From Swiss-Prot:
It catalyses: (4aS,6R)-4a-hydroxy-L-erythro-5,6,7,8-tetrahydrobiopterin = (6R)-L-erythro-6,7-dihydrobiopterin + H2O. This is Putative pterin-4-alpha-carbinolamine dehydratase. One of its GO terms (molecular function) is 4-alpha-hydroxytetrahydrobiopterin dehydratase activity. It comes from the Bacteria. NCBIfam families: PRK00823.1-2. Keywords: Lyase. Its EC number is 4.2.1.96. CDD domains: PCD_DCoH. Gene3D superfamilies: Transcriptional coactivator/pterin dehydratase. The keyword Cytoplasm does not apply. PANTHER family: PTERIN-4-ALPHA-CARBINOLAMINE DEHYDRATASE (PTHR12599:SF0). GO terms for biological process: tetrahydrobiopterin biosynthetic process.
Length: 96
């Protein structure tokens, strides 16, 4: 899966709320009600990531979970990252 060109990357970001590029990865921070909710959210992300064999970087700070995605094999951002980003957004929406 090829790395997205700058224009395609910008277009993909514009179609998604809250995702930005940070240090060569797409990133988003989610706010959960409590620490246990944050941990459950991460558990669900882990299940989804395992299903597609694509694993995000995850940072947990109390009730805030930051996700960062890039395709390591391609050394950049690909459609695979946006596919998992969309899945994570759906997991978050279902948890609300």
């Amino acid at each position: 899966m090829p790395v997205l060109a700058k224009a395609a990357l910008q277009q993909a970001l514009e179609q998604r709320s809250g995702w930005t590029v940070v240090d060569g990865q797409i990133s988003k921070t989610y706010g959960l009600a409590t620490f246990p909710f944050a941990i459950e959210f991460v558990r669900r992300i882990a299940d989804a990531a395992e299903e597609v064999n694509h694993h995000p970087d995850i940072d947990i700070r109390y009730n805030k979970v930051t996700i960062a995605l890039s395709t390591h094999d391609e050394k950049g951002i690909t459609e695979k990252d946006f596919g998992l980003a969309d899945t994570i957004d759906r997991i978050f929406a279902a948890a609300q």
